[in-house]
Amino acid sequence: MSKWIADKNIHTVLITGGTGFTHRDSTPEAISVLFDKEVDGFGELFRQISYEEIGTSTIQSRAVAGFANNTVVFCLPGSTGACRTAWEKIIASQLDADFRPCNFVKHLVEA
């Protein structure tokens, strides 16, 4: 992870799995310490959208995102459905420079 966020050619990192509550689920704790800024709205929006798909089970997701060295990092649940939801309904548009009114692209190339 440290190599990726140090690489000027990598602007986005997607991590899947480890966002639940079992003893093996430590992705948010391991990755969030690297964040310069957390994208609080990502987890909130992901759970809101997921609620429409899986109901209250979404409360078990600890999906997080943040910026580390001008790289945006998304920590997603391990299920393919959750990854698809995050990509199609949140991440893809935020990585599109033409998406309005705002997107993440300018934050990825400022350094």
Each model region followed by its residue ranges:
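Non-catalytic beta/alpha edge segments that cap or flank active sites
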Residues: 1-111
